[in-house]
Amino acid sequence: MKYEYIILGGGVAGLYTAYHILQKSPNSSILILEKENHLGGRIHTFSGKHMIVEAGAGRFHEKNILLFELLKELGLDSKIDKISGSASFAPIENPGVFMNSILDREDVGSLDFLRSGMGFSPSVDFLTPIYKLFFDMALGKQNIPNAELIFRVIIASKGEPLTKLQNISFLQFAKEVLTKEEIDFIAGSFGYYSELVIMNAADAIYLMEQHLTPMNQFYVLKGGLSQIIEKLESKLVKHKHIKILTNRAVKQIHFSKNEFTIHCENLETTYIGENCICAAPTGVLQKFRIFHPVKYLLNKIDCQPLCRIYSQFPKGDDGAVWFTGLPKLTTNNDLRMVIPIDEKEGIIMSSYTDNKFARKWNQLFEKEGEPGINRRLISLLKETTGRDIPLPVKSYVFYWDCGVGYWSVGANSAMVSERLLHPMKEMKLFICGETYSYQNQQWIEGALETSKKLIDILSL
């Protein structure tokens, strides 16, 4: 059988694309091939004996318009739940001392005056007393220094050519503004690492201003984000011309005589389609010969690992868990971020890491298993909080080798994103996913946005 559309990837980008194709053209024949034994990709709500937690994507914010629209369409909008964006920095040099962070606060007012509205590009020297006063008013004297340091870098960037910022990392650019000690402090206290060293400065600054800004309200979905996947799947399978196959790892894509032939590993069966839509990360696409002409564009996106470690802790003699009252933390050891989830059930995200820190945890887990993870967690949590830490009842490690994509140094993200959507005009080959989003990379919104653009190209 020849399908009108073959979609490679059963994550949210692939399912959302199929959903919109069928909305506009209900009789279209569609085949979705997913390499795992389940749909969802990096949206995965883990449900086990000890906890129900987000193994992959976790939160979204008020600017994620397409996601809000989708949640309403799927009848999930009543489950949207506000979460506090506030966080504190816990330096290991002073265990138990927590410093506030403006970058995660919601109630500090607008910072737009720092970006626009002045009618000119203000100098760092001019703005320093203004935003220093602003930070003191918002946070008092215990504000975390990295907020001021990061904003000094952002302000300094406003007078720089875009091409310069695209060709250096955030920390490389920061060297022109800050001292080595200040840069080291940012690297230690800013929870995310890849944004500082992997992303080009232009896109990293955009991410900080638009997605990590304290003005955004953040949310989670009660019951888990996997409900989005389940709802989309249930709507898709109602159409008689769609087929969804899991455990189908694509080995090769061939194009000849205006049609695509898809070969899967360990299967003699091939699949034929008129349109091929690839909703998979760059690392997958780079293996296919058909994408070699645009490999130089795919190389502009650097996929880096993420690792979430959740633990359930026992209650003490007083009936409370050790992390009672603990705020969300960033810290300058291998934990990087610590996020309490449910004090009543004793659930905490004991570590959330990216880049080299995520790899280190995964290597430890592969070598020493859960006991090794627990030993390391107890040591680092005590180092960070100054509290006595009991042995966890259970810990789960969720490691993603390609957690999210980053626009790398040298990338013109606007151009590359546009080019990769329909990379070779002579064939009906398309790409979508958060990885390829110009302005919403690293968010579910990016998957939906690139899918929407693809649908527009198809002109259904």
Where are these regions (language model features)?
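Glycine-rich FAD pyrophosphate-binding loop
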Residues: 22-48
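Dinucleotide-binding Rossmann-like beta1-alpha1 core, especially the glycine-rich loop
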Residues: 51-140
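N-terminal Rossmann-like FAD-binding beta1-loop-alpha1 element of flavoenzymes
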Residues: 3-32
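Active-site/ligand-binding neighborhood in enzyme catalytic cores
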Residues: 135-249, 256, 289
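Central helical "cap/lid" subdomain
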Residues: 254-255, 262-321
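Charged, often glycine-rich, active-site loop that binds/positions anionic groups
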Residues: 94-104, 251, 256-260, 264, ...
